[in-house]
């Protein structure tokens, strides 16, 4: 009686795998973003994958779609409510408060990367497990810091080769002008024939209504009062200083007075990077200033500013522009051994190359020379090392330059130096 074959298991819906040849591009984008942050003085912070649910309910905003519809929340075995992190800023702020990082040199400048989780309808560029790289600068309310953060995000996108995006920004005001604007906006919204759920949202946070993507709501709110027209003098001055410094840095931008970010903690400067090559899911990253978030989470009255760039979205944007970026992790040397004695020696050679910092791999199994050389091509190797009885007798190896189609014998004693000088 034949044994029944077990059913295969697939990844959960909306959770992508990044496998070769895409994984080097994924790492290239992620690591480039992280490196640019490091160049600007942002130190790495590693955050928990899940947190106490209260952190996001209080920090992100109870009226946001993220909290009400998109979070992966569950009770652990101790019956504590925990949530897979939907974004990074709240977790960074929690860590800063918990470990007293705000008691030292300010601003605290941190960067992070990793997976985040939102229950959304999966489509191109929108996944339930999304990959982001972000920075946070905490503790100083300075327009120059806003300009630095925005310019850093802009530079990061340029370094990976993106050109077909635009930067949109606005100001969401501060505690002195937002209450009056809130009343004015609610007065406008309550005159509209809103459905019950939208009216409830207008009561809790009317800005959320302006963020509604339904065409009928967008049409009804086209004449809604705008925050940018109701800024306090200090908020207006702050925004003008930020845009002036962006001009000095040659960072191109478009002021979008109708912009509303999907998280409640943003104040003053708010921005988003948009790429029209992605269709409906055009945002590739964004961020802004958050003046009250730390106090809201039980810490000091300190402000901060940050951004998150979507690695998944940026990969799609690169594809739309027919560009590629890699992490440089290709195999430089691929070994091909002909015979058991040669294979034993090749194992030693490959290990010595790796110890010298040269990426190297070799053919395994009993493939012939032709099949093994195909492996070198698939690996993207610059050099192939061929070792057989002749080479063993002469204490050398045949080095094939796969880029320039040349071949020569190199002494085993000089091999590492020869490869290092050629790379």
From Swiss-Prot:
The keyword Amino-acid biosynthesis does not apply. Its EC number is 6.1.1.21. SUPFAM superfamilies: Class II aaRS ABD-related, Class II aaRS and biotin synthetases. Gene3D superfamilies: Anticodon-binding domain (3.40.50.800), Bira Bifunctional Protein, Domain 2 (3.30.930.10). PROSITE patterns: AA_TRNA_LIGASE_II. The keyword Ubl conjugation does not apply. It catalyses: tRNA(His) + L-histidine + ATP = L-histidyl-tRNA(His) + AMP + diphosphate + H(+). One of its GO terms (molecular function) is ATP binding. GO terms for cellular component: cytoplasm. One of its GO terms (biological process) is histidyl-tRNA aminoacylation. It is found in: Cytoplasm. Keywords: Aminoacyl-tRNA synthetase, ATP-binding, Cytoplasm, Ligase, Nucleotide-binding, Protein biosynthesis. NCBIfam families: hisS (TIGR00442). PANTHER family: HISTIDINE--TRNA LIGASE, MITOCHONDRIAL-RELATED, HISTIDYL-TRNA SYNTHETASE. Belongs to the class-II aminoacyl-tRNA synthetase family. Homodimer. This is Histidine--tRNA ligase. The gene is hisS.
């Amino acid at each position: 009686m034949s044994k029944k074959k077990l059913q295969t298991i697939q990844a959960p819906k909306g959770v992508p795998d990044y496998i070769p040849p895409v994984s080097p591009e994924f790492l290239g984008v992620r690591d480039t973003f992280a490196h640019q942050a490091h160049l600007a003085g942002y130190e790495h912070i590693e955050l928990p994958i899940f947190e106490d649910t209260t952190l996001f309910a209080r920090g992100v905003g109870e009226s946001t779609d993220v909290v009400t519809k998109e979070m992966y929340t569950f009770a652990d075995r101790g019956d504590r409510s925990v949530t897979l992190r939907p974004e990074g800023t709240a977790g960074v702020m929690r860590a800063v408060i918990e470990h007293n990082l705000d008691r030292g040199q300010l601003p605290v400048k941190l960067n992070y990367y990793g997976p985040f989780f939102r229950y959304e309808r999966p489509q191109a560029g929108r996944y339930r497990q999304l990959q982001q790289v972000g920075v946070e600068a905490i503790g100083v309310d300075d327009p120059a810091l806003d300009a630095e953060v925005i310019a850093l995000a802009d530079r990061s996108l340029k370094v990976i080769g993106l050109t077909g995006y635009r930067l949109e920004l606005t100001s969401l005001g501060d505690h002195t002008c937002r209450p009056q604007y809130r009343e004015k906006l609610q007065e406008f919204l309550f005159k509209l024939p809103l459905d019950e759920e939208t009216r409830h949202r207008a009561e809790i946070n009317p800005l959320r209504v302006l963020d509604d993507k339904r065409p009928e709501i967008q049409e009804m709110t086209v004449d809604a009062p705008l925050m940018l027209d109701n800024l306090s003098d200090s908020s207006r001055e702050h925004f003008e200083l930020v845009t002036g410094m962006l001009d000095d840095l040659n960072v191109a931008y478009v002021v979008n007075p109708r912009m509303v970010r999907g998280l409640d903690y943003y104040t003053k400067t708010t921005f988003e990077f948009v790429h029209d090559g992605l269709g409906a899911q055009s945002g590739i990253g964004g961020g802004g200033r958050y003046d009250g978030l730390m106090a809201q989470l039980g810490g000091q009255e300190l402000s901060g500013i940050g951004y998150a760039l979507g690695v998944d979205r940026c990969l799609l944007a690169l594809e739309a522009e027919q560009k590629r970026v890699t992490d440089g992790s290709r195999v430089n040397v691929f070994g091909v051994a002909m015979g058991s004695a040669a294979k034993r020696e090749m194992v030693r050679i490959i290990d010595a190359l790796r110890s010298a910092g040269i990426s190297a791999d070799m053919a395994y199994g009993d493939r012939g020379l032709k099949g093994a050389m195909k492996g070198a091509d698939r690996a993207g190797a610059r050099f192939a090392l061929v070792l057989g009885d002749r080479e063993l007798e002469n204490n050398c190896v045949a080095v094939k330059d796969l880029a320039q189609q040349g071949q020569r014998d190199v002494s085993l004693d000089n091999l590492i130096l020869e490869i290092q000088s050629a790379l």
